Amino acid sequence: MDRSVSLPHQPNKTTTVTLVETSSNPSGMVLVSPYQTNRVGDPMDLVSLAQQVQKGDEFIRANACNRLTVIADQIRYLQEQARKVLEDARKDAELHHAACNVVKKPGNMYYLYMRESGQRYFSILSPREWGASCPHKFLGGYKLQHDMSWTPQEDVEKRDAEIGIMDKLLNRQTALPACTEPNFEGLSQ
């Protein structure tokens, strides 16, 4: 049985309260006084029920909004990560297509130069090794990684440290304990 109730602090808004259906023969038993079991009591009880229903609706909405906000933040983060992946792939492809007269081997440094004609090419000689006789404009040094990506010279030390950490983790993976519960150890330190 549905009842619409106006709340005291919101007279223009009604909230529907659903009450338990009435029966004069519950479970096949005839009631002596069905009025006592089926009557709607104090009107303030309905208001309290309506306030509770409305509060539940508000909390559900707030929780859903909070969870959707977290998901939206995650989507924005993933979109930014996707943009970065595509930009890195574009830069790596450009570097792979630069002219080069030597077979490039992962783990080695290569130095990018540009001729007056605009041609970009890789050399194994750094500007320091060329000295004052460097024939073309130096564009940057790059390390060819084993995954065939390129790391700018200024980021090589940081990238090598990251790869070292990953290697350690991979070498230790057999020692990692199986966790069936969330493990937050080390996050607070």
Swiss-Prot record:
Pfam families: DUF2452. It comes from the Eukaryota. This is Uncharacterized protein C1orf50 homolog. The lineage of its organism: Eukaryota, Metazoa, Chordata, Craniata, Vertebrata.
